[in-house]
A protein has these predicted regions:
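Cytosolic regulatory regions of ion transport systems
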Residues: 1-452
Length: 452
């Protein structure tokens, strides 16, 4: 697909890389010369120095023939203006990043009036992810497939679970659990395991299951499944606002620590059910006096990554509650993964994921087989959901007879309302959706899972 992307910052660069790697014809527009040169030299894309709200610049970028137009500059208003001009100039699907909470209740109206196909609010998306994690606190990461019916869940394996030295093929009979372990992080590496793989304490385990089966599995390995009933949030920005709104609707007691008095007044007016505390969140004595040791969830949402990391490490020392850490910068995710910060939420990653998912949905409408794609475990593993449109070498054959590529696991088959963890005798049929986890990037078709 031909894609015009306005905004070459961290999110724009990440999108340029991912979309170009997936075979799209990408043109990036930015007003910053250094960004334009860096993106043009680093990725297989065309880069243009110019203003994305200029019809001349958009014409140079080829917006008239574009299939998709994406605006992710630092200005909400500029993103909306760019999309409006792009829609006027061509017939593309337009996607805008809009972050200001004051627009949150007007997004449907804006989409309808301007004709934008999708609006992504990364802070709202981050709040929703955190809310999901607080409803299922034993998980450190949750992704969904099959319209939310199938979940890919990550957790840290400790002595408490009693799975040290257990082979994966023993889990169904030993625990009466219908789940499938898809990936394991160990000693800095990632493994796509077979049934003989033996788990060890310290592993980061990712498994696939329905919500009901995941709940049962967590109960049997003594991981918490009851939603949290109270949360202590440090940082009163947009994510804290959206998150608190969701939590209060679910009858969770919410306390927000915010150092800016004016912001505290705003939060108190907009969130009357929350307790707003005007204090420096890095004040350790204050956090302890506010019941850090007994809180069921601690969420670090300041605007400074380093402060969020230190706050979470302090909370980890004093609390047994669920820990969530917001990180803005994408560069140090591999280092942060080794610090055990609980669940790490990257709003910028979410923007990329959402937009890539949307582009893939458009491809699927045009006959492309990939319905959903997640890049997980620090971008080292791809989890893909394929729609089977036609017969191929992967269909109509018992899975035990398929020669699947190395480092690839076929995890789930959904057939109508039926969800199956596949066994050797199962077959893929036309009309199925198939979920695959692999270390290999760039699979585009179900045929790609089978050795040539």
């Amino acid at each position: 697909m031909k894609i015009v992307l306005v905004g070459g910052g961290k999110v724009g660069a990440a999108l340029a890389r991912q979309l170009s790697e997936e075979g799209h014809n990408v043109t990036v527009v930015d007003t910053n010369k250094a960004r334009v040169e860096h993106i043009g030299e680093s990725y297989d894309v065309m880069s243009i120095l110019g203003n994305g709200s200029s019809i001349t610049t958009l014409s140079e970028a080829g917006v008239e023939d574009a299939d998709v137009f994406i605006a992710v500059t630092g200005s909400d208003e500029l993103n909306l203006l760019c999309c409006m001009f792009a829609k006027k100039a061509g017939h593309c699907h337009a996607i805008a990043r809009v972050r200001n909470p004051s627009y949150s209740h007007e997004l449907d109206f804006i989409k309808k009036q301007i004709g934008i196909s999708a609006i992504i609010n990364p802070e709202m998306a981050a709040a929703k992810e955190i809310s999901h994690l607080l409803r299922f606190p034993g998980a450190s990461k949750i992704d969904t497939f099959a319209g939310g019916r199938v979940r890919l869940i990550k957790f840290a394996l400790t002595e408490q679970q009693g799975l040290d030295g257990v082979a994966i093929h023993e889990i169904p009979t030993r625990l009466k659990s219908d789940i499938l372990v898809c990936a394991v992080e160990r000693d800095g590496g990632v493994i796509i395991p077979n049934g003989n793989f033996v788990l060890q304490n310290g592993d980061q385990v990712t498994f696939l299951a329905t919500q009901e089966k995941a709940h049962e599995f967590f109960q049997r390995i003594h991981l918490p499944v009851r939603p949290v009933r109270n949360a202590l949030i440090v940082g009163g920005g947009a994510i804290a606002y959206y998150l608190s709104h969701e939590l209060l609707e679910n009858h969770v007691r919410v306390r927000i620590v915010e150092r800016d008095p004016a912001r505290c007044n705003e939060l108190a007016e907009s969130l009357p059910g929350a307790q707003i505390l005007n204090e420096d969140g890095s004040n350790r004595e204050f956090l302890l006096s506010e019941g850090l040791e007994s809180t069921e969830a601690f969420v670090a949402l300041t605007n400074i990554d380093e402060e969020n990391v230190l706050l979470t490490l302090f909370a980890k020392k004093h609390s047994q509650g669920k820990l969530v850490t917001k990180i803005n910068r994408l560069e140090f995710d591999d280092i942060l993964a080794g610090l055990d910060l609980g669940s790490i939420v990257y709003p910028k990653y979410m923007t990329c994921d959402y937009i890539v998912q949307y582009v893939r949905a458009l491809q699927n409408e045009a006959g492309n087989n990939i319905k959903t794609l997640y890049r997980i475990l620090d971008d080292r593993v791809e989890a893909l959901e394929f729609t089977v449109h036609e017969e191929s070498k992967a269909t109509g054959v018992p899975l035990s007879q398929l020669h699947l590529k190395k480092n690839l696991l076929l995890c789930c088959i959904t057939r109508g309302n039926e969800i199956r963890i596949p066994r050797g005798g199962d077959q893929i049929r036309v009309g199925d959706n198939v979920i695959v986890v692999t270390l290999e990037h760039g699979l585009h078709d179900l045929r790609d899972i089978v050795e040539d």
